[in-house]
Regions:
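Short, Lys/Arg-enriched N-terminal segments with co-localized hydrophobic residues
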Residues: 1-3
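Sec-dependent signal peptide recognition
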Residues: 6-13
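Hydrophobic h-region of N-terminal signal peptides that target proteins for export
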Residues: 14-23
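Amphipathic alpha-helical interaction segments
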Residues: 20, 55-56
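Beta-propeller-forming repeat regions
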Residues: 27-31, 40, 49-54, 64, ...
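Beta-strand-rich domain onsets/edges
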Residues: 36-42
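Short beta-strand elements bearing conserved aromatic residues within extracellular beta-rich modules
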Residues: 58-61
């Protein structure tokens, strides 16, 4: 009995050690993100729970009218939610809110303040500098300047086409704004990046750990950063008579999130073909069609492949051939970590298993992320973990 008890104690210690053995992931610094909006005749206040907060952290909510002294509006610290409905507020007045975390009955440092104007709408509005013929499309957020507050990065689209549709498109445009409406920059991907939902997957994340998010996306000859710097050869036009881009170089670029200036550009992995100008038959053999549909289905994500640092993963294809390329941003350079190609020897079961989306998760509990790619999963080391064989579904 004594021996069994010692075994159980040892097992308990081992389990505790294993559960805490994984290194802390490199995370972005964020403030409380306090925001308030009208909610009927009340004011809805919300804030952010941080990963560094104690599990038993509660919050007090403070409100000030105009320039008066702030008063606490909650009776007891709020510990079950990260929002509060202020039923005693008057939406015709301007209020300033902030919260203070409470741990073991003691108030800690107050959050940043948020001012709600009188008669405000129940949403935040950011005026856009939308070019003629364009409209706002996909958006992402990231802390571009390191102040703990998210900025908004918007993909503006003009004429666009699905991969299955022929036709000339307008160049994809990206703009960044602060939450107060301040315009930061514009990037124009140019005529050699086709516009459409499947073509440009842009990632916004702090890839190098400097506290500021970068922007990464596929670029082409003639892409222009916010400072007017041209990527590749702007004189080239690789579009064919049907509007598809089946030849020419392909690039992967990472941009400074605050300025929109290109940091580094490298060859995109994997290119549509080993040749710069492949024939339609050569493309069909590799991708299943030769006119630019299946080969230009792109996905992307950010994953903690080593369990600590974020890596950029750019993906191509899911109907037939599938390629995932993982990159790290080190010293201002994109460094290839690994490439998974379903055409490689032993990877045939992983072909044609992709979908129109992907997920990132530590599915095997080793503290490192895997890429769940439709009906198959790629391990953190770039090797196939498993494939269900169900196919595109």
């Amino acid at each position: 009995m004594l021996f069994m008890k010692k075994q159980k104690n040892l097992l308990f210690i081992v389990l505790i050690f294993c559960s805490s053995a994984f290194a802390q992931r490199q995370m972005e610094y964020l403030n409380r993100g306090v925001v308030a909006v009208p909610d009927g005749g009340n004011i809805f206040v919300s804030w952010r729970l941080l990963v560094t907060d104690d599990d038993k952290t509660a919050f007090n909510i403070y409100r000030a009218v105009d320039n008066s002294k702030a008063v606490k509006v909650n009776k007891t610290p709020v510990d079950a939610f990260t929002h509060y409905i202020d039923v005693k507020a008057d939406s015709t007045k301007s209020y300033t809110y902030y919260v203070t975390p409470v741990v073991k009955g003691k108030e800690l440092a107050a959050s940043e303040k948020f001012t709600l104007p009188a008669l405000a709408k129940n949403y935040l509005s950011i005026p856009l500098r939308t070019p003629e013929g364009y409209s706002a499309n996909d958006a992402s957020v990231g802390d571009l300047d390191g102040d703990g507050e998210y900025e908004v990065i918007i993909h503006l689209t003009g004429r666009a086409k699905d991969n299955s549709q022929a036709g000339i498109t307008d160049p994809p445009i990206f703009q960044a704004y602060k939450m107060n409406g301040t315009f930061l920059w514009q990037i124009n991907l140019g005529k050699n990046i086709r516009e459409g939902a499947h073509y440009t997957q842009f990632m916004v994340y702090d890839l190098d750990g400097d506290g500021k998010a970068e922007i990464a996306m596929k670029t082409g000859d003639g892409s222009i950063d916010s400072k007017g710097n041209v990527i590749g050869d702007s004189s080239k036009d690789w579009r064919n008579e049907r509007g598809y881009i089946l030849s020419g170089p392909e690039y992967l670029s990472v941009f400074n999130g605050l300025t929109g200036e290109v940091i580094n550009t490298t060859d995109y992995i994997s290119p549509r073909h080993g040749k710069l100008n492949p024939t339609t038959d050569e493309l069909k053999t590799m991708w299943g069609d030769g006119y630019g549909n299946r080969m230009d289905r792109f996905l992307a994500c950010v994953a903690y492949l080593d369990g600590v640092h974020p890596s950029l993963v750019m993906c191509r294809g899911y109907y037939t051939r599938t390629i995932l390329a993982a990159w790290d941003l080190k010293g201002g350079k994109l460094v290839k970590r690994w490439v998974f190609d379903s055409n490689d020897e032993g990877n045939k079961p992983y072909a044609g298993q992709g979908n129109h989306n992907l997920s990132v998760a530590d599915v095997d509990g080793d503290g490192k992320d895997e890429i769940v790619y439709g009906q198959m999963t790629i391990d953190d080391n770039g090797k196939g973990l498993y494939s269900t064989g169900i196919g595109h579904a």
